[in-house]
Design a protein with these regions (language model features):
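Rossmann-like S-adenosyl-L-methionine
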Residues: 1-132
């Protein structure tokens, strides 16, 4: 939602139906009319959108703890968005996902965030740019 004022259209994919309902409510509350949200398996929904002709300039992936699903990584490589932002709560899984994505993307920057001081938990955000 935070990118909606800079985008022609924002399409959010989310496994959790309650999160989709919250996103729709927040978009409405903030008068964001260029947003749509789809609930269900993210890889399946994103593939369906790609087949319908959606071609994103920017993709933000914020997967569950297990990391980005291999099917979704394959789709991300196929979509070839100019910019990919990968969010992770597990640095090891982020490293694994970035290695897989390196086939089509170059890592520009990785920034850790200590949202939970004095705990071993760290969030990381990686900025990737499409190769070629």
């Amino acid at each position: 939602l935070f990118l909606a004022d800079r985008a022609l259209h924002v399409h959010g994919f989310e496994q959790c139906r309650e999160a989709v309902a919250c996103a729709r409510s927040n978009a409405k509350r903030n008068k964001l009319h260029n947003c749509s949200f789809t609930a269900g398996d993210v890889a399946v929904q994103a593939k369906r959108a790609a087949r319908a002709g959606e071609s994103p300039d920017i993709v933000i992936a914020d997967p569950p703890r297990a990391g980005i699903d291999p099917k979704l990584i394959a789709l991300l490589l196929e979509l070839r968005a100019k910019i990919l932002v990968a969010v992770s709560c597990d640095p090891a899984r982020l490293a694994r996902d970035l290695a897989r994505l390196s086939e089509g993307y170059q890592v520009q920057h990785v920034q850790p965030f200590d949202f939970f001081p004095r705990t071993p938990h760290v969030e990381s955000v990686a900025l990737l740019v499409r190769r070629g």
